[in-house]
Amino acid sequence: MAVGISPGELRELTEEELTERLRESKEELFNLRFQMATGQLNNNRRLRTVRQEIARVYTVLRERELGLAAGPGEPDGKES
């Protein structure tokens, strides 16, 4: 999984790819929290990075839902 993916890169992904990225990030966050609880987490910063990535994915999905941004293959950001 890429560390610190940019919103521009996320906007280039399809909705299915975004959903998959969201699922993977949530799974990673769960594993990181489990490691933290058991005292095995070496990189605390990764928790924040994964949470930010999840928020970015949700933001891109919401932009598309509201018609503020176009996904790949769509002519523009507005729905008709």
UniProtKB/Swiss-Prot annotation:
One CC-aspect GO term: cytosolic large ribosomal subunit
Gene: rpmC
Keyword Zinc-finger: no
PROSITE patterns (alphabetical): RIBOSOMAL_L29
Organism, scientific name: Mycobacterium marinum (strain ATCC BAA-535 / M)
InterPro entries per the UniProt record, alphabetical: Ribosomal_protein_uL29, Ribosomal_uL29, Ribosomal_uL29_CS, Ribosomal_uL29_sf
Protein name: Large ribosomal subunit protein uL29
GO molecular function, one term: structural constituent of ribosome
Biological processes, Gene Ontology terms: translation
Similarity comment: Belongs to the universal ribosomal protein uL29 family.
One Pfam family per UniProt: Ribosomal_L29
Keywords associated with the record: Ribonucleoprotein, Ribosomal protein
